[in-house]
Curated annotation (Swiss-Prot):
Function: Cell wall formation.
Pathway: Cell wall biogenesis; peptidoglycan biosynthesis
Stored Pfam families: Mur_ligase, Mur_ligase_C, Mur_ligase_M
Gene it is expressed from: murC
Subcellular location field: Cytoplasm
The protein, known as: UDP-N-acetylmuramate--L-alanine ligase
Recorded catalytic activity of this chain's protein: UDP-N-acetyl-alpha-D-muramate + L-alanine + ATP = UDP-N-acetyl-alpha-D-muramoyl-L-alanine + ADP + phosphate + H(+)
Length: 485
């Protein structure tokens, strides 16, 4: 059966949304919103969307036939059947107000994702860290096994050139967002939880027990024949496991894990390990990603694929040939500075645990390099809530260039800004950080800071990602020695 025939068969089994033809996204340029819009436009729906600026997501959607509107205005929703919003959108947005006045249904992003998943075999990946990488690895394994899944990911899957794709099979592999508890809308067949830590606590009223209970509720959205795939190395996951009334498959480095990694080693950007599973032969894996945290992400993909009887050869090949995800330990090149050659890596991690995992991966893969990090804190509330953890983790690099907080719409919080964090790290006495008041000042500092052989990392979830690309395009007047990846 050809892919066209397979897709026609799939569509015959999935009812169209009754009377819904024209779908409008408010904030369509976000990765999550844009991914769902891409799947829907490829399914044949008329897609429009608004955002405050053009970006790579909106450009791709426009090339696929979506109508992109820059700016938010009431008339944008006058001819649509449903409006999709994310929690980042202000309720006073003129398009939201107009939709309410016109009695047009307004649904959250996760509700639309749940609708896509309703008649498919859904695999939903949740957790504080590692969701994007794990989702990408699972999608890659299923693609290698010719399962041709639909996927919606929170980052760019390099091999696909996009973060979302409409497949021809019954599978939908999607990142599940706990930041606003909207993942409770999803009803997958398989749920993955990578880990659970305190983050986005404003959603949960500062109550960590409420956050844990919400993850339990998410797993109980599984049908009685579904499966929860969980990282047993995580302390909080071990704590909630007795509360899970579904089949559980565990993974990790722990000997208790159903899917266990042994013999881990790292060589530069690659990790190698052997996977042990009950009732199956051991398999040697080479993963084209660095760090123990990425081995855990790969174990989740192996566990999901093994439950679905995907052949080990597809798993081995997909992990070995994995091309990575945008802004996840992304190697941007080798640059010739006035003081010598410097390696540039960009990473999205913005929680202390994520930053620590990145530091460990850098140390393990390039032990002889001095580690220089330009870090941009993300959100005042996160900086406040995890302040001491940030001080501890950021003190572990060799040289720190600390930018001010990327607000992400939040009002400043006294004592939780970049200057305060810089002072606290300096008082710790391990390193003497350099405060960078504005991102556009970073390039001017680098010639005096970088040394031959350094590993220079740009780290954070704000606009430092765009800044790293500018640096990679010779914003310092540096010559790229290795082609950008």
């Amino acid at each position: 059966m050809t892919k066209t025939e397979r897709y026609a068969q799939l569509r015959s089994m999935i009812p169209e949304m009754r009377r819904i033809k024209r779908i409008h996204f408010v904030g369509i340029g976000g990765a999550g919103m844009g991914g769902i819009a891409e799947v829907l436009v490829n399914e044949g729906y008329q897609i429009s969307g608004s955002d405050i600026a053009i970006n790579s997501v909106t450009e791709r959607l426009a090339s696929l036939g979506a109508k992109i509107i820059i700016g938010h205005q009431a008339q944008s929703v006058e001819q649509v059947d449903v409006v999709v919003v994310s929690t980042a959108i202000n309720p006073q947005n003129p398009e939201i107000i107009a939709a309410k006045e016109l009695r047009i249904p307004i649904v959250r992003r996760a509700e639309m994702l749940a609708e896509l998943m309703r008649y498919r075999h859904g695999v939903a990946i949740a957790g504080t860290h590692g969701k994007t990488t794990t989702t990408s690895l699972i999608a890659s394994v299923y693609g290698q096994a010719d399962r041709d899944p639909t996927f919606v990911i929170g980052g760019l899957l390099n091999s696909a050139g996009t973060n979302a794709r409409l497949g021809t099979s019954r599978y939908l592999i999607a990142e599940a967002d706990e930041s606003d508890a909207s993942f409770l809308h999803l009803q997958p067949m398989v749920s993955v939880i990578t880990n659970i830590e305190a983050d986005h606590m404003d959603t949960y009223g500062g109550d960590f027990e409420k956050l844990k209970t919400t993850f339990v509720d998410f797993l109980h959205n599984l049908p009685f024949y579904g499966v929860a795939v969980m990282c047993i190395d995580d302390e909080v996951i071990r704590e909630i496991m007795p509360r899970i009334g579904r089949q559980v498959v565990t993974y990790g480095f722990s000997e208790e894990a159903d899917v266990q990694a042994i013999n881990f080693a790292q060589n530069g950007h690659q990790s190698s390990f052997t996977v042990k599973r009950h009732g199956k032969d051991n398999v040697d894996i080479v993963l084209n990603l660095p760090g123990e945290h990425n081995v855990l992400n790969a174990l989740a993909a192996i566990a999901v694929a093994s439950e679905d009887d995907i052949d080990d050869s597809a798993i081995v090949q997909a992990l070995a040939e994995f091309e990575g995800i945008g802004r996840r330990f992304q190697h941007l090149g080798e640059f010739e500075t006035p003081n010598g050659s410097v390696m540039l890596v960009d990473d999205y991690g913005h929680h202390p645990s994520e930053v620590l995992a990145t530091i460990k991966a850098a140390r393990a893969g390039w032990p002889d390099k001095r580690l220089v990090m330009a870090y941009q804190p993300h959100r005042y509330s996160r900086t406040r809530d995890l302040y001491e953890d940030f001080v501890d983790v950021l003190s572990q690099v060799d040289c720190l260039l600390l930018l001010d907080v990327y607000a992400a719409g939040e009002a400043p919080i006294p004592g939780a800004d970049g200057r305060a964090l810089c002072r606290s790290i300096r008082l710790r006495g391990q390193i003497d950080p350099i405060f960078i008041a504005s991102p556009d000042q970073l390039a001017a500092v680098l010639p005096d800071v970088l040394q031959h052989g350094d590993l220079f990392m740009t780290q954070g979830a704000g606009n430092i990602g765009a800044l790293s690309k500018e640096l990679a395009q010779s914003n310092l007047g540096c010559k790229v020695l290795v082609e950008e990846q």
